Curated annotation (Swiss-Prot):
One GO location term (cellular component): cytoplasm
Subcellular location: Cytoplasm
Subunit structure: Homotetramer, a dimer of dimers. One homotetramer interacts with 1 SecA dimer.
Superkingdom field: Bacteria
A single GO BP: protein tetramerization
Biological function: One of the proteins required for the normal export of preproteins out of the cell cytoplasm. It is a molecular chaperone that binds to a subset of precursor proteins, maintaining them in a translocation-competent state. It also specifically binds to its receptor SecA.
A molecular function GO annotation: unfolded protein binding
Biological source species: Bartonella quintana (strain Toulouse)
Pfam families assigned: SecB
Full protein name: Protein-export protein SecB
Gene expressing this chain: secB
UniProt keyword list: Chaperone, Cytoplasm, Protein transport, Translocation, Transport
UniProt-listed InterPro entries: SecB, SecB-like_sf
Length: 158
């Protein structure tokens, strides 16, 4: 393959993390200290994940990973964690068709271990065992997002 076919401008492809940041964080332990007693079974853990991205300036993207984690035992909320963790990525000289997968798959994949650690530390500091969230398939989330966008564009009147 000729190098000019790999990228648009003839420059070397660039993918770099410029910064990472904690945008918003909340840990609620509404039933403490009652919620900290030993339990016979593991609580129900509900995890919601969302990825958003916006271009900011030339070749830079702000990618935000939002996580909401709730632990419930019967009707009692044990804890609720909300985290918005972001990063600014510099993406240059990469073919246009690869930008969105890079932004919505690879960028959150790089952010996730840091967000996971924050949630683990918060649950442990809240008096619970550390919660280690399983790895997330960001490719599947991206495919689902694309399918929903296509479905919505087909159902909207012209």
């Amino acid at each position: 393959m000729v190098k000019s076919e790999i990228n648009n401008n003839g420059g070397e492809p660039v993918f770099a993390v410029l910064t990472q940041y904690l945008k918003d964080f909340s840990f609620e332990n509404p039933s403490a200290p009652r919620s900290l007693r030993p339990r016979e079974k593991a609580p129900q853990i509900d995890i919601n994940i969302n990825v958003n991205a916006n271009p900011i300036g030339d070749d830079n993207y702000d990618v935000v990973l939002s996580l909401s984690v709730k632990a419930n035992d019967n009707n009692e909320t044990l804890f609720h964690v909300e985290l918005i963790y972001g990063g600014v990525f510099h993406i240059k000289d990469i073919p246009q068709e690869h930008i969105m997968p890079l932004v919505f798959i690879e960028c959150p994949r790089l952010l996730f271990p840091f967000a996971r650690q924050i949630i683990s530390d918060a649950t442990q500091n809240g008096g619970f065992p550390p919660l280690w969230i399983d790895p997330i398939d960001f490719a599947a989330l991206f495919q689902k997002r694309v399918a929903e966008e296509q479905k919505n564009s087909q159902t909207q009147p012209s």
